[in-house]
């Protein structure tokens, strides 16, 4: 709450208190404003037997006290919270501490501990990225020093660094949502406690709202009904907000910087009127119409990265067709799919764009059929496109995220979307480093570091050129794969394909199919230096499916030696 809002609220409390005192003494209150008179009239109708009243300003720490305390003639004590708002606005609950809210409100010290650990990791990454933006590559890890550098280079947020802020807050939101999802699925009573505290159920909450006219005053009691656990829903909105729907009312938890780029993070809480089905349908129709309007205004402008544009537009059209199939689904961010189309569709020629638009209509059936096989009965509650730059788990590279309700549990399903011109085209998955490919992130069977260092030394003295270095490294890597167990090979393939379900549209043929990443059938075979001296290939499912790993330098030859990457391309069987 801003200083001005706080002052207005405090003055309202003081005015109501003074008027109520006079009224209890049977004195006239005509000298007070209409707002004050209507408020005390409402209070006295609720509690006609008031003996006396005290204000929070009678205490030494008013901010930690209830606005008014009523002492009834029966001996009962009533705590009152007073709110004064313009008509159409919502009351603002007290903000919660980002590093304490899960323990304080949801009664989970363990969940708070996990969140705080992730918070520190993401905050350090954020500071490092902002400093790197200004200074280039660096090896500074001390948080205090990083904050000092951020404050000196960026005293305020600018367009230059907004992406790093948004990514950081997005990851906090995702971590919070995941923890609350687990908490919800455990049917934990912490949700009930959070509802009671945030919605002040043990107090009487009086909202006075006013319009432009002096006599336009409405006073009401804020007392939402306590929901059962089955009436509670989790949702997301924007890029930094988690929502909790308690029956008919919603509570939002929004992560934000207190002010400047190096300052602390706040958790702003707010009450949210959850959109009804008709409102959600209207929002979704508006999104679809905007996308259709763009399609009709298409003008082709040739660019070098056509395949990336096709992939991005495929993501947006998949989103579009989900809105069409599920017209009342909640959109986390209605603007994003429109922005995606607007950014990329001009890079695709008219014929290809029409094929892509038409063929993508088949993908919803492919995905929903796979979800039916997996969960039987489910409800899609929300839909979201995940920007590449925001992905926190490099093995979970989903483009589309669906939040599902399955047997009264909340399930998050990430889906990796691919668009191919032909059935036998290959899909690029990840670009892991040669140094880490055998480590725990992928195959978990050792390291290539000693081999890389040996080849690098020979490159440095001129014994090997770029091509020879890649051939030697690729062969050594292939031989290590050839000695791996089936379990290690399957693990590596799983991790290269990622955790997300894969949905593919073959837009040249107008079909789509969907696969779970766990579907690795039959023996995995290793083909060393196939199809070239700088590649190795793994095949499975009677060699109908494969991953090819091609070695390359991360920079062009003019830079000399640079880190070695592996381009991972897979070919999957197209099952309709």
UniProtKB/Swiss-Prot annotation:
The keyword Nuclease applies. One of its GO terms (molecular function) is type II site-specific deoxyribonuclease activity. Its cofactor is Mg(2+). It catalyses: Endonucleolytic cleavage of DNA to give specific double-stranded fragments with terminal 5'-phosphates. Keywords: Endonuclease, Hydrolase, Magnesium, Nuclease, Restriction system. The keyword GTP-binding does not apply. Its EC number is 3.1.21.4. It comes from the Bacteria. It is an enzyme of class 3 (hydrolase). Monomer. A P subtype restriction enzyme that recognizes the double-stranded sequence 5'-GGCC-3' and cleaves after G-2. This is Type II restriction enzyme BsuRI.
């Amino acid at each position: 709450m801003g200083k001005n809002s706080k002052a207005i609220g405090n003055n309202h409390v003081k005015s109501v208190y003074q008027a109520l005192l006079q009224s209890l003494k049977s004195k006239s209150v005509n000298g007070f404003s209409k707002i004050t008179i209507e408020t005390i009239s409402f209070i006295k109708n609720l509690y006609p037997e008031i003996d006396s009243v005290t204000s929070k300003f009678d205490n030494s720490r008013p901010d930690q006290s209830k606005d008014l305390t009523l002492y009834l003639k029966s001996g009962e004590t009533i705590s009152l919270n007073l709110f004064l708002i313009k008509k159409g606005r919502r009351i603002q609950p007290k903000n919660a501490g980002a590093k304490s809210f899960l323990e304080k409100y949801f009664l989970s010290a363990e969940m708070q501990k996990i969140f705080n650990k992730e918070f520190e990791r993401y905050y350090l990454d954020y500071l490092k990225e902002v400093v790197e933006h200004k200074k280039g590559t660096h090896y500074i890890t001390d948080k205090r020093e990083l904050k000092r550098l951020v404050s000196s280079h960026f005293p305020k947020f600018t367009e230059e660094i907004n992406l790093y802020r948004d990514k950081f807050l997005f990851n906090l939101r995702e971590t919070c949502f995941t923890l609350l999802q687990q908490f919800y699925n455990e049917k934990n009573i912490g949700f009930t406690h959070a509802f009671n505290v945030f919605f002040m159920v043990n107090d009487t909450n009086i909202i006075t709202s006013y319009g432009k006219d002096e006599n336009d005053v409405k006073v009401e009691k804020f007392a939402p009904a306590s929901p059962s656990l089955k009436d509670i829903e989790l949702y997301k909105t924007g890029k930094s907000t988690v929502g909790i729907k308690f029956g008919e009312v919603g509570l939002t938890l929004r992560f934000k910087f207190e002010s400047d780029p190096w300052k602390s993070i706040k958790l702003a809480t707010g009450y949210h009127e959850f959109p009804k089905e008709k409102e959600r349908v209207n929002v979704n129709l508006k999104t679809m119409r905007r996308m259709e309007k763009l399609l009709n205004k298409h003008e082709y402008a040739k660019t070098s990265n056509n395949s990336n544009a096709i992939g991005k537009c495929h993501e947006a059209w998949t989103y579009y067709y989900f809105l069409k199939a599920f017209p009342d689904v909640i959109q986390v961010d209605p603007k994003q799919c429109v922005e995606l189309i607007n950014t990329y569709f001009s890079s695709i020629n008219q014929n290809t764009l029409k094929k892509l638009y038409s063929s993508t209509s088949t993908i919803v059936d492919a995905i929903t059929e796979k979800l039916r096989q997996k969960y039987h009965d489910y409800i899609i509650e929300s839909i979201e496109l995940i920007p590449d730059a925001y992905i926190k788990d490099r093995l979970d590279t989903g483009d589309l995220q669906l939040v599902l309700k399955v047997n009264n549990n909340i399930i998050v399903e990430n889906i990796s979307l691919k668009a191919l011109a032909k059935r036998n085209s290959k899909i690029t998955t990840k670009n892991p480093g040669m140094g880490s490919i055998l480590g725990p992130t992928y195959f978990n069977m050792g390291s290539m570091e000693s081999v890389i260092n040996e080849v690098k030394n020979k490159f440095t003295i001129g014994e090997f050129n770029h091509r020879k270095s890649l051939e030697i490294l690729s062969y050594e890597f292939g031989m290590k794969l050839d000695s791996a167990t089936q379990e290690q090979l399957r693990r590596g393939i799983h991790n290269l394909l990622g955790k997300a379900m894969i949905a593919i549209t073959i837009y040249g043929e107008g079909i789509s199919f969907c696969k779970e990443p766990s579907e690795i059938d039959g023996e995995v075979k290793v083909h060393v230096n196939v199809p070239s001296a700088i590649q190795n290939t793994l095949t499975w499912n009677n060699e109908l499916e494969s991953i090819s790993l091609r070695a390359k330098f991360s920079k062009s030859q003019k830079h000399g030696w640079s880190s070695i990457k592996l381009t991972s391309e897979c070919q999957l069987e197209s099952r309709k």
